[in-house]
Design a protein with these regions (language model features):
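Class I SAM-dependent methyltransferase SAM-binding "motif I" and its flanking Rossmann-like core
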Residues: 100-159
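General beta-strand structural signal in soluble alpha/beta enzymes
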Residues: 38, 113-118, 165, 191
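Generic beta-sheet signal
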Residues: 8-12, 80-88, 136, 161-165, ...
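Glycine-rich, flexible N-terminal cofactor/catalytic loop recognition
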Residues: 1-64
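Conserved helicase motor
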Residues: 60-69, 142-146
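Short Gly/Thr/Asp-enriched flexible loops that form oxyanion-binding sites at enzyme active sites
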Residues: 94-109, 176, 180
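A contiguous loop/helix-start segment that scaffolds small-molecule binding in enzyme catalytic cores
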Residues: 1-2, 6, 82-83, 162, ...
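Short active-site oxyanion
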Residues: 30-36, 110-114, 162-163
Length: 279
């Protein structure tokens, strides 16, 4: 493969629904790129029209069904010196959207990858959810099959960080019901739909309450679901901690090992547990 000169892959952050959110850099790259790969070429044409941008480069489709086939040609074009832009229907490429395979292949070929950052449904939903944003994890779309979905939620039930999911309107009722069953109906959550669009809506409440709300009034449009992390377990009282240490020592553990194990089990400083047993 020829050496890369100015060739590169540029990931474009597209508006979630409001064209006014498009950055100046997005406009510039769309107008100047040699090749633009779009998840939906018709949506790209509408966006370009809304932004009054004339795309001078060649436009090709790039979506889940043709990623494997089209990736090599995009990487080859960038390796030959072309500026190749990738844009999805909304948000950042690679984040539950096409792009990951292209980025991996570009890195493997020594082709530079950069981004023109833009809107993200993940961080937008977090910001408006009213739930803790200091630590979070993005889980993408839950499994479609109920059994696999419940198993995924069971594995996440004790996750302390705020969780963010994408979900389709026709599956959100089942997803909320399974979350309420696995996490408990009172776990706080926010259902965010049609973010930045005219019919934007944020429904907040416990998972059980949201499940009932969705059953009565099914939402439409693109959905981002934000769920609070598992609450911290209450600290056992001093007598219970002493009893745990004593039980471990009776089972053969040394005093030091028993204290270490109890402190680790409850997320407490070792010296705090040691002080209780030394009194």
């Amino acid at each position: 493969m020829p050496a890369v000169a100015d060739g590169r892959i540029v990931l474009l952050g597209a508006p979630l629904g409001n064209p006014a959110d498009a950055s100046g850099r997005l406009r510039s790259v769309l107008a100047s790129a040699d090749l633009v790969a779009a998840e939906d070429t018709r949506r790209l044409a509408r966006l370009a029209s809304d932004l009054d941008v004339v795309i001078s480069g060649r436009v090709v489709s790039y979506f889940e069904g043709n990623e494997d086939r089209r990736t090599p040609s995009l990487v080859a074009a960038a390796a030959d010196g072309a500026c190749v832009a990738l844009i999805t229907d909304g948000g950042m490429p690679s984040v539950s959207d096409p792009g990951y395979r292209l980025v991996v292949a570009a890195h493997a070929a020594g082709v530079p990858v950069t981004a023109a950052p833009g809107p993200s449904a993940v961080t937008t939903a977090l910001a408006v959810s009213g739930l803790p944003c200091d630590r979070f994890c993005f889980e993408g779309f839950p499994p479609r099959r109920a059994a696999a979905r419940r198993a995924r939620f069971a594995a996440l039930a004790s996750e302390p960080r705020t969780l963010v999911f994408f979900e389709a309107p026709h599956r959100i009722a089942g997803t909320l019901a399974d979350l309420a069953g696995g996490f408990g109906p009172d776990r706080p959550a926010a259902l965010c739909r049609e973010l930045t669009k005219p019919y934007e809506q944020v429904r907040r409440g416990g998972l059980g309450e949201l499940a009932e709300s969705v059953a009565a009034d099914p939402p439409r449009g693109e959905i981002t679901l934000v769920v609070a992390g598992a609450p911290a377990a209450p600290r056992p009282d001093d007598a219970a901690l002493r009893a745990e240490v004593a039980a471990r020592r009776a089972a053969g553990a040394t005093g030091r090992d028993a204290v270490d194990a109890v402190a680790a089990a409850h997320g407490l400083p070792r010296r705090e547990v040691y002080r209780l047993t030394a009194d």
